[in-house]
Amino acid sequence: MSVLTAPRLRRVAETDAHEGPVYAADEDAFYFTTVRRERVAIKRLALAEGTVSVVRADANMANGMALDREGFLLVCEQGTLTEPARISRLDRATGELETVVDSWNGLPLNSPNDVAAARDGTIWFTDPSHGYLQGFRPEPQTGDHVYRYDPASRELTAVLDSLDKPNGLAFSPDERVLYVGDNGAPHHLLAYDVEDGGRPVRGGVLAAFTPEQPDGIKVDEQGRIYASAADGVRILDERGEQIGEIELPGAVNFTFGGPARDVLYITVDTAVWAAELDSKGA
């Protein structure tokens, strides 16, 4: 099925899948974070069996997730009024958990929202003040930044500091362009060239989202950009022109998966849906 036409959707599982979708090819499993209530859990959907299990019952208001180049699960822990926000790293085999980073220049993070791992090992994440605005985090002490963390030097750098509410982020296939969704008013998808050394430059608005907000962002092998909104997943070319859409009301986030990375797994708070494409995730 072409990405330019509506692919057939099938419901994979009924479960409280909200954010952080990650496909682990070595397990043929789909990881996600649950709908925020008193707590948020990290769960695992075994795709072959269709069974859901709890990986971490209380995950500190976890939101976005990604696999790093070693296969560990990077988790955006938004934190609470009493627990600090951080980026953590979870060993899927043992359950061992460690802090990657929890502060910038000695100041606590706001509420990390989404994360992407670059091929050079650096970790990029957005840190909007959503937690404070939603009443489960203290007043922010820093701006709503996009950060780059270098595990080798342990240096955390604010690479973008002019966005209102940065949310989803993803790289182009060659990692020379960084895409970021801004959920402030107005709602935009932005694109930035990434120079050697890992700093975004020469960027700006690629596409406007009205009235919905861009949330999850992914890119396929051809460089097409996929962005979730409340009405489904929109597909844009590198110029920001919409060239397709997967209509699914209530869509929150998504990821490419399957052995060939040609299935889009989409969370909608009450279920996980799948759309088979003839394009592959980058």
Language-model features and meaning:
Residues 1-282:
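Sequence-structural signature of mature extracellular/luminal beta-sheet repeat domains
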